[in-house]
Amino acid sequence: MFHQVWAALLYLYGLLFNSMNQCPEHSQLMTLGMDDKETPEPHLGLWYFIAGAAPTMEELATFDQVDNIVFNMAAGSAPRQLQLRATIRTKNGVCVPRKWTYHLTEGKGNTELRTEGRPDMKTDLFSISCPGGIMLKETGQGYQRFLLYNRSPHPPEECVEEFQSLTSCLDFKAFLVTPRNQEACPLSSK
């Protein structure tokens, strides 16, 4: 009888613990579904960088002086190629243009992007419940970080809270939110 009561108590404790632990399993992160089309149409257009998370602040240091970043994702000149243009507004007001070329790796449903000229860098796309939001995981030589982007420069605060909660569960304890106090720099067409 004692063993049955003890087993029932342990079972109830386990249920209670699991209900309080809101962290999803890493495998439960939903990758963005892409079919085998040449470009991921829904992901093209303007995006604003909102926040980043990493195991350490050193992996987010590149964003220390950033006030805001606006990106434009466009289809590239070749199949399965994406052109990314950005302008970075630094905290001291300077506009810094950047551009990258991404290559979608082969395979139906694959969401892995490779950055041209940076063979060590891999980018995976994930969906989040935040309206107009997308989450990227960048992995390179000596760093890994999650980045939150949104179609709006000022998404609801719940989006940032959800992102921080999710990444914290994955042991990405360093967190950075861009201030977005200044006007975004205009995007260059070059």
From Swiss-Prot:
The keyword Chloroplast does not apply. GO terms for molecular function: antioxidant activity; lipid transporter activity; phospholipid binding. Residues 1-17 form the signal peptide. Tetradecanoate binds at residues 138, 145. Its main location: secreted. Disulfide bonds join 23-169, 95-185, 130-159. Keywords: Disulfide bond, HDL, Lipid transport, Secreted, Signal, Transport. Expressed by the liver; secreted in plasma. InterPro entries: ApoM (IPR022734), Calycin (IPR012674). Gene3D superfamilies: 2.40.128.20. GO terms for cellular component: discoidal high-density lipoprotein particle; extracellular region; extracellular space; high-density lipoprotein particle; low-density lipoprotein particle; spherical high-density lipoprotein particle; very-low-density lipoprotein particle. It is found in: Secreted. GO terms for biological process: cholesterol efflux; high-density lipoprotein particle assembly; high-density lipoprotein particle clearance; high-density lipoprotein particle remodeling; lipoprotein metabolic process; negative regulation of plasma lipoprotein oxidation; response to glucose; reverse cholesterol transport. The keyword Secreted applies. Probably involved in lipid transport. Can bind sphingosine-1-phosphate, myristic acid, palmitic acid and stearic acid, retinol, all-trans-retinoic acid and 9-cis-retinoic acid. Belongs to the calycin superfamily. Lipocalin family. Highly divergent. Interacts with LRP2; LRP2 mediates APOM renal uptake and subsequent lysosomal degradation. This is Apolipoprotein M.
